């Protein structure tokens, strides 16, 4: 299974495979046509409370990862759907955050690889 992460604002490429948005909110200023999202799994994103608490603060990264992984344990249906898509071909997890290292897609990718 090939799974990677990418900012949704980056240019879509054929190599992206199935493009899955893993944000709870639609990215600002981006039309559906430009985003070229194949699947929007907003339910797999961190809860609104966790997202607001984290606020993309790198100092909270370690605790954010722990809390988000705990939330993912209750999202088996969504994780299963994502794994099923990944078994069919390449998948790109899309996120809107500016920080490429500290975002939920990075944690989700780690978790998917761990569960494979």
Regions found by a protein language model. Give the residues of each.
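Residues lining hydrophobic/aromatic ligand-binding pockets adjacent to catalytic sites
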Residues: 1-116
């Amino acid at each position: 299974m090939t799974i990677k992460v990418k900012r949704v604002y980056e240019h879509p490429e054929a190599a992206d495979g199935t493009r899955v948005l893993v944000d709870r909110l639609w990215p600002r200023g981006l039309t559906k046509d430009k985003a070229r999202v194949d699947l929007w799994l907003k339910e797999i994103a961190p809860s609104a409370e966790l997202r607001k608490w984290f606020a993309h603060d790198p100092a909270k990264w370690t605790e954010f990862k722990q809390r988000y992984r705990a939330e993912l344990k209750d999202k088996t249906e969504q994780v299963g759907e994502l794994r099923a898509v990944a078994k069919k071909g390449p998948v790109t997890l899309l996120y809107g955050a500016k920080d490429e290292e500290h975002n939920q897609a990075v944690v989700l990718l780690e978790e998917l690889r761990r569960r494979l």
